[in-house]
Each structure stands twice: as C-alpha cells, then as structure tokens.
C-alpha cells in the first residue's frame, strides 16, 4: 500500500472535525495545559512557511501534553481590526468586514490543512459584536477607575495614513517610509504609568526570555534620582529638573529645556526669540525617537537667559534642545558635560565649559568619563563637601543637603508614557462614551456599541474619524439630555489585550469570562510568538490583565507564565520573506508537493526553534523519505497493502534504543528542542530497519512519539494496527531508566581537581575499575608519575579525581 499523503491528510482532518477530537473541557481530576499562539492579523497575502513555525511548535506541545494526560486548551482566532483592511476599503470601497471575512477563510483553510489541533469551537474574531461588547466593557472598567482620560497632547501624526501613532509604533512606520510629525490633538489616553512599578517587578514572576524582559524593563525605564530646584539668575523664580546623578551637580555648566517647556517663552530674550521659535517648529516635526537617538547630531539654541547652579552659585546658560522631552522628568535637565556623553558632545559643539567633578582616568576635555566607579572631586562649597565620596554615599549626602534647604527631593521616574489609545479611523471598536451639551461625559449603557455603515472610509484629516459624518449614529438624546458620541475608535491592540481570556469562555453572553473557567485555565502555560511584540502587545496585555486582576475578573497577576519566541525562517536566499523580494514560499504550495506532515517535521528539523534559519525546498525531500521509511515499517510491500507487524518482543538492541528514544524525545519535546527529538526518532527508525524489526511494541511506541510532529501518518498507521480510537487519546510511552542508560559513557579524569584527560568505558563500571582505567590514561600519567596518590574519588559514569602530592 502506497503512502498517499493527500488522501490520508484529508481523511484525518475530516475525522478530527467530525469527532471534535480536540475539544477542550474543564476536567478537575486532570492537570490542565493552556498553549496559545499569538493570534494572527488575517492579511490578504495569506500564510507562508515562516508563519507556520510557531503554530507548528505550539501544536506539537498541545498534542504531546494530551498524550501525557493533560486537559489541553489550544485555541485559534483572529486579530481582525487593523489598518490594512481599512486602507483597502479606502482604495476599493469594499467594506473592511468583507475583506476580513475572505482573509480569515483563507488563513483558516491553511491552518486546517496543516492538521493543527485547535479547538475550533472556541474560534473568536475581535470584530464580532459579541467580542467587541466585552472589549468595550473592559474599556469602561478602565474609565471607571480613572485610567482612561482625554487630553490634548502632542501626538505622532502620520500624514499619509491620517492617523495618530502610539510611541511604540513610530519606528516601524518611519522605517516603512511614512512621515511622522508631532502635533497637538485631543486624544484618549490610558494611564499605564499607574502600573509602571508592578509591570516592572512582576517580570520576576514569569518564565520569559531574558532579552524580552530586558526590553520591557528598558521601555518602562525606571530611574532613581532627585528633583532639584535652580533659580533663574537675577530673580526669585525657580524651576525644577530631574537627574539620576545629583552627585555631579557641582559640574553642571549649562541647563537644557525641552522646546515644549512652558517656561521657554518667558525666559527667552528678545534677540533669541526668532531662533527659539524656529527651532521649536522644527522639533515639532520630529518623533521622540528621532529626537533622542544617541547617534543624532546635537542641536540646540541659546535662550539668552541664565540659571544659578545651587551648589556653586555660578550663573550657567539655559539652552533649548530637542533631545529633552517634556514627557520625561520635568522637561528640564542640568547638563554635566564631563560625565555624560550627550552633554559632552553638546558642550564641545557649542563651546560650553567642561568641569571634572568625578575623578577621571583621563582628561575630560578630551573624552567623557561617565562611570560611577570613582570618587567625587571639585565638589564642595561653604556648606557641604562630597569630595572623596563614592557614588552612593555622595548621592545620599548631596540629596539630603538639597532636601534640608527645601530645594529638592528624592524622586523615582519612569520613561514609560501613558498609552495613546484613540485612533481617527473607522475600522476599530467605537469608544463607548457620550458627550452631553452640558459638558458631562457618560458611558454607553447598551453594549456593544456597533460601527454604523458608512459610504466613505477616508479619515477626515481633522482629527476625527469617518464616524463624525454619520449624523444618525453620532447624535442622540436620552434622559440626561442631548449627546454626541465619541468619534475616536480603539487601536488594533485593544482586542489583542485580552483575547486569551475569551478563548476560555467564548460564548458567554453575561461575562467576559466566568470565574470558574478562568480559575481552571489561567494562566497561559505556554505562549509562542515573535519577539517583535515585546514592548507592544505583551506590555499592553500585561497592563490590562493587572487592571482586570484589580477589579476581580482574573485570579492571576500575570497572563502568560512561559513565553517562547521562535526564530524567523528566511527565504532560500537568506533574506526575510517578502513579496517585494519575490522569495515568499507559500504554505499551501509546499503542502501540495510534500504533505502537511512533511512540512511540520521540516519546519522543526531546520534547527533550534529560537534561531533564525533559511528555508530549503531541497531539504524537505529528506523528511519526505523519512516518512516513507516510517510507512514501510507497517506496510513493507507497497504492492499487497498488508500490515506486516508481529507480536514478538523487540530484540535487546532495539529495546535499548527504544527506551533511549522515548527518554530523549520526551525530554526534548518538554523543552521545545524539537530538532533533536526528530533526529533521535530518525536514528530509531534506522535501527528498526537495520534490525528488520516488525515488533508491534517497537512500532507503536514510535507512532506515539512521532504523532505530535506528524499526526496524519501516525493516525493512519495507528488505525492500521487495529486501534479504533484516535491516537490523540493514547498515552505517551514511558521509558525504563535501566534500559535507557547509555551503553558507553565518557569519564573525565582530574588530578588535584584539574581536568587532565578522559576515557570511554561501559556504563556502570565499578569505582575500582574506573580508577584503574584512569591510571592508564597517557595524559594523566605525567601528572601522577613519581607522586604519592593520597586520595582517589570516583563518581560513577562521570569522573575520577586523583589527589596527589
């Protein structure tokens, strides 16, 4: 019987759907495992082989955990609001909902062809009214807690898209060639800053890649420092700055205000007004990222005014520069060029004095010294001296002095800014707020508030969405009076902030999620997706989760226990897959040629899951041959189609290899080392072929190990071996530790604790024999010859240590 992957895969996909094989249930007597993919935005271009990597990894884990006796939740849905569908609507007039439905059907078809074991009964779509209702409900919880508010803020305005971008989105859009400028606009903000410390400290509770944790820590940007007051020279007026290095205040030789600082107009002298105004206008056109880049050329304008350094009493010039942001600290800084790289470059460019106040190993006129591992110098006045003090002691002493004089206080600052939440687009969740003629603001009482139909999708360009043009939707009257609805919509991030909760209870009309189901399934045990979401989706979702924890909706502090970032699969040319490069390999085309099982195995066999690696269509041929070998273990003669398996016990050789394979595959699958698990199964299959093994035990255990990776062929062969129930409900085999031991082990030989050689020996060699063999190792003899051996230590199967004198 021939291995016909096309028919076999269709057969088993239909079987799984008909029997709802992967339907998740809450079973109190079983451990649970919640494995989740970052659900996709259903774009028009469909899925290529790179997209499938993370989905394949999560599916292997889900199938493996079922075999290990877990009740598994493995859902899939669609993050379906978003700009691309709206841009397409603007061009073609096609409603974004229709475009999205077509794209979802295309995506779903590919995922089903891959044999992923999703519980499709839990499928969700962020644009469905039943889902929008609860996204809006969560927004109102934020609103009730004072965490959602309106403000006129300088925003990142993209002229081409006619939309406001969150700080976190600017970099991507600029790289895509869009122009982003700063302009003030009425916006909805979410007070994520209120959760900054919790977002920071709770990172210690999750099993995430350290690189992602570090990205979040840097984005939150906690700075411990002090706020200090500086007087304007010749006045009684003072202004406050924030610094993380109050110990360097004696070296402050100039001040810098943000171009948006409210004091700037007041202090700028007449002769400098036009230059300052022009500079401010230029700064408004730049994003925060452009303004603060360390590599950018330092620019600035002198205001004509001076401040008094409170430590030295000297007048120092006040400048304005765009690298100081109004949103961080106080929007004003003291500049210590000797000990800060940016300040040093600025001072050098504009001829400002540089004064050493931290003892440096070189001249600070030639290069900056920014280290903390030295002591203060040139840092005293009539009231205080911090000379000779190291950083921490100097920090405390000078800050105490400022506090006693009423000129400062200790302060913790965060770089994290409140989340700019509103969008001036049509295709998003309407913000459920009504604005009344008397100035009052009230929440919508009937949710969901659905989007109305519109005839044109173009953003207005005025700061309002196309919803502002739908009078019958926009205006209304209730018992409180006449109102106008909010025309801003939510960003795409809103729906993805909590979708993992809705998967737990997708059809509940009365609650976002029932407490009983939430307690059973949360948190997500394994979350797989790209590292590019580190400071966007992952931070936002953690914020919403903490709010939901505070209002009693969830029982866990964190949503995702373990996070794994898969590496990118490149095109065959070693470049990122993209239409423009013409190197995209679609998932459907490869499946048509080789079958889903081969694609799944090859995706995982390419290399470690976390690494970047190129695709090779030639490479999948080897995987295809491997599956042919597996098939022929059960059907050795294609012509007669008879199962040729015996009930004979495996030979000793096969038995040992089988137990080693069970051990290795189990351990590697647990730790997501899928490439080495597959290698081990290949070795096992070769052993079975070599030994001409037809043992049912040996072959069934192979199918159980292989089924999470290549489920269709394993289901077919499992059935051929006489099993009526899906292999999904079988149990992963257990290994015998004695039989799984290596036959040969490498023993390290140390002399006085230093490695001097190794030798190979049979596993289980006695301690005396280990010591005897160690004494024969040539590289060891020269360290023991002519010396007294005072102690001999042997650790079975590992090492021998000889102590000599």
UniProtKB/Swiss-Prot annotation:
It comes from the Bacteria. A motif ('HIGH' region) lies at residues 40-51. Transmembrane segments: none annotated. ATP binds at residue 579. InterPro entries: aa-tRNA-synth_Ia, Leu-tRNA-ligase, Leu_tRNA-synth_edit, M/V/L/I-tRNA-synth_anticd-bd, Methionyl/Leucyl_tRNA_Synth, Rossmann-like_a/b/a_fold, tRNAsynth_Ia_anticodon-bd, Val/Leu/Ile-tRNA-synth_edit. Keywords: Aminoacyl-tRNA synthetase, ATP-binding, Cytoplasm, Ligase, Nucleotide-binding, Protein biosynthesis. Belongs to the class-I aminoacyl-tRNA synthetase family. This is Leucine--tRNA ligase. The gene is leuS.
